[in-house]
Amino acid sequence: MLFKRREFIQTGSLATASLMFPKFLKAFEHKNLVPPGNKVMVVIQFSGGNDGLNTVIPINNDIYYKERPRLGIQKADALQITTDAGLNPALSAFRELYDNGNLSILNSVGYPNPDRSHFRSMDIWQSASNANDYINTGWVGRYLDAQCSGCDKPTQAVEIDDMLSLALKGNKQKGLAFTDPRRLYSSSNESFYKEISKEHVNSEAAVDYLYKTMGDTISSANYIFEQSKLRPSSASYPSTKLAANLKTIASLIMSDINTKVYYVSLGSFDTHINQAAQQTRLFTELNDAIKAFTGDLKKNNRFEDVLIMTFSEFGRRVSQNASNGTDHGTANNMFFIGGDLKQKGLINTMPNLADLNSGDLKHQVDFKAVYATLLNKWLQTDDEAILGKNYQHLDFI
């Protein structure tokens, strides 16, 4: 008997979806899906617009301290890494990574005609589009389309969240979103299928599509759950959300699941009011989670196979506001953490605070050049086909 679309969504039963298991599970017949040295990328999104100037601090810049008389971090408090730059005091693990050659920092990253809306700028970053272009697929999603058309690897991209970000949505392929492998089916399917139902309301093939999608997702859930039990991380992690998410990722990486891209978020960095306390709290969570995660990877000889990237949808304005915070800005910095970096430390110069665009930093590096570098050099795919343009590759990997 054929279910109506509404009945299918309402029941959401494992029994109906199990009809798809035999065909789909052929993807998992071979025990060793991942070759040694499999490269993995972990993206950490700083949601809300992190203040880059109080992240990588221009400790000898008089303009910085003039524009931030209360908010500026003093040279004596910063974790100095070069003559002119220091890290936020809460990022001690990053200072250690820097000293060990496992941290690269790229300043003044952005895009032309920047947008100060959280939602629009995040869409631009996640879709890898120009400011005036509207694209409904993400840069990782298009990687999945290019890399996984007809392939037998349905878990190539995973987001540790209840909702899948635009970044991981392609035209034909999508990543998986979940917070815990044990709860993947119950925690992520409801919102996922609501989205599918909206996209296929008038489609005659809607029910067949839903059957297949649900079967694929539940099969993936079973596979991920079983793989996550093979080599669960035994390391001690802090009791924070980010740390728990990174521990889940560590367990999946060490289980040799075939995932190439992991995606997590931390926030909110929208620090209009009392920025110092809020950013310190978030950076403490970040710092402690990264310390545990990188230590875990090193202990299990996987650190050289993993590249961690951080980004935010925009930076903040150079001047502090009247509420001991900062308002929406433009260009920002990015961190790259890994055991196989080719260009270490500060990749480029600190932002020029004497040459601003109406109080905002001018971008010197297009973020899409960063994506092109990651796609080409780390994920070993055709970046121009995915991004629609040829960007000059950077040298940090």
Model-derived features with residue positions:
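A post-motif C-terminal structural segment
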Residues: 315-319, 324-333
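Feature for exported/extracytoplasmic and membrane-associated proteins, marking the mature portion
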Residues: 1-300, 319, 333-397
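Acidic/histidine-rich, metal-coordinating catalytic segments
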Residues: 307-314
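Conserved H-loop
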Residues: 303
